């Protein structure tokens, strides 16, 4: 039997997942139960789109609850005090020079469960995140990405 996947996370990431889990269990479940009650009051379920929609939403929420519980149960929280501040790790804020676009970009390296590329939070498992892990200021890395190879120089490493 394979071992459960460990989810590398920052303390902040764990807190956000715990808050989402609490919201889904306490607020969202009640909302959906009410929607189902209202839909049932309409009678015939064979053509009751409100009922179908509420049951689909319930299935999605219950699936997300199971997913969050699993992620939290298997979380591996990065202790930022144990990692040198000048080495890129999960929890680092890294400023890099992107040679392809000739611009400076700042990334926050997070576990895959916390990744949010729109807010420059990249996973330690992504090509760029993986390439940056363990590096320090002045290092130049080349990363294979879907479009080819990207080249970055690490300009700054800070803690989130």
Swiss-Prot record:
Task: Reply yes or no: does the keyword Cytoplasm apply.
Answer: no
User: GO annotations under biological process?
Assistant: DNA-templated transcription elongation; regulation of DNA-templated transcription elongation
Tell me any Pfam family this protein matches.
GreA_GreB_N
What InterPro entries does the database record attribute to this sequence?
GreA/GreB_C_sf, TF_GreA/GreB_CS, Tscrpt_elong_fac_GreA, Tscrpt_elong_fac_GreA/B, Tscrpt_elong_fac_GreA/B_C, Tscrpt_elong_fac_GreA/B_fam, Tscrpt_elong_fac_GreA/B_N, Tscrpt_elong_fac_GreA/B_N_sf
What family name appears in the similarity comment?
Answer: Belongs to the GreA/GreB family.
Report which residue ranges the record marks as coiled coil: 12-76
**UniProt keyword annotation of Cell inner membrane present:** no
Give the protein's function: Necessary for efficient RNA polymerase transcription elongation past template-encoded arresting sites. The arresting sites in DNA have the property of trapping a certain fraction of elongating RNA polymerases that pass through, resulting in locked ternary complexes. Cleavage of the nascent transcript by cleavage factors such as GreA or GreB allows the resumption of elongation from the new 3'terminus. GreA releases sequences of 2 to 3 nucleotides.
What is the primary gene name for this protein?
Answer: greA
From the UniProt record, which GO molecular function terms apply?
DNA binding; RNA polymerase binding
User: Could you tell me the keywords of this UniProt record?
Assistant: Coiled coil, DNA-binding, Transcription, Transcription regulation
Instruction: Report what the protein is called.
Output: Transcription elongation factor GreA
């Amino acid at each position: 039997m394979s071992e459960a996947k460990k989810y590398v996370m920052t303390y902040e990431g764990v807190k956000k997942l715990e808050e989402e889990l609490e919201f889904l269990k306490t607020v969202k479940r009640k909302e959906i139960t009410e929607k189902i009650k209202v839909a049932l009051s309409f009678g015939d379920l064979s053509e009751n789109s409100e009922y179908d929609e509420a049951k689909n939403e319930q299935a999605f929420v219950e699936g997300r609850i199971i997913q969050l519980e699993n992620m939290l149960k298997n979380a591996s929280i990065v202790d930022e005090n144990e990692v040198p501040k000048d080495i890129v790790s999960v929890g680092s804020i890294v400023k890099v020079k992107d040679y392809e676009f000739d611009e400076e970009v700042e990334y926050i390296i997070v576990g895959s469960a916390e990744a949010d590329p729109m807010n420059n939070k990249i996973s330690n498992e992504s090509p760029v995140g993986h390439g940056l892990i363990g590096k320090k200021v002045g290092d130049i890395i080349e990363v294979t990405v879907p479009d080819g190879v990207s080249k970055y120089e690490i300009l700054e490493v800070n803690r989130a």
